[in-house]
């Protein structure tokens, strides 16, 4: 059985400890709890920080890394767009500066696997270099677990 791994990166406007990031930091725990209770959620990366977010340094920038595993694309989509997470997603420009797209990568893994940040960043580099493929794909240009391109099913964002 395969599960869907997803990673996204976002360049923070400021460190998470700064006042301008306060609204986001306060929302991290509640939104993560919603994810964990969502149908189809399997796992997410947690850091030792109190807010559970993983931040990397990239040059002089703070880059937030989100990494999770889901039973299916539909489960991930429901959380991203149909839960309270969607409201924060629509306001992301308050906390994050634009990055080289894409900033989200998906790939299929064996059930029970737990991808790491290094693998996620490698998959994202592969996607940015080679475009969507069964090894690394996007929310809009997906691949099935067997490697076939996903058919364009329209999923509502409401």
Residue ranges and their predicted role:
Residues 1-61, 75, 102-158:
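Short S/T/G/P-rich N-terminal loop/turn motif that feeds into the first structured element of a domain
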Residues 61-62, 80:
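Soluble secreted/lumenal catalytic domains
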Residues 64-67:
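Extended, compositionally biased
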Residues 70:
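Exposed, tryptophan/tyrosine-rich binding patches on extracellular proteins
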Residues 73-101:
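An amphipathic, aromatic/His-enriched active-site/gating alpha helix that lines ligand/cofactor pockets
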């Amino acid at each position: 059985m395969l599960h869907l791994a997803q990673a996204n990166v976002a360049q923070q406007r400021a460190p998470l400890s700064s006042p301008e990031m306060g609204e986001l930091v306060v929302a991290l725990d509640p939104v993560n709890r919603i994810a964990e209770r969502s149908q189809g959620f399997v796992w997410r990366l947690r850091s030792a920080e109190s807010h559970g977010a993983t931040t990397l340094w990239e040059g002089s920038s703070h880059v937030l890394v989100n990494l999770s595993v889901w039973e299916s694309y539909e489960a991930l989509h429901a959380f991203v767009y149909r839960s309270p997470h969607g409201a924060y997603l629509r306001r992301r420009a308050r906390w994050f500066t634009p990055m080289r797209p894409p900033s989200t990568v998906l790939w299929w893994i064996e059930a029970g696997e737990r991808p790491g940040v290094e693998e996620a960043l490698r998959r994202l580099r592969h996607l940015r270099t080679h475009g969507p493929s069964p090894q690394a794909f996007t929310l809009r240009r997906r691949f099935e677990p067997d490697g076939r391109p996903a058919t364009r099913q329209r999923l509502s964002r409401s």
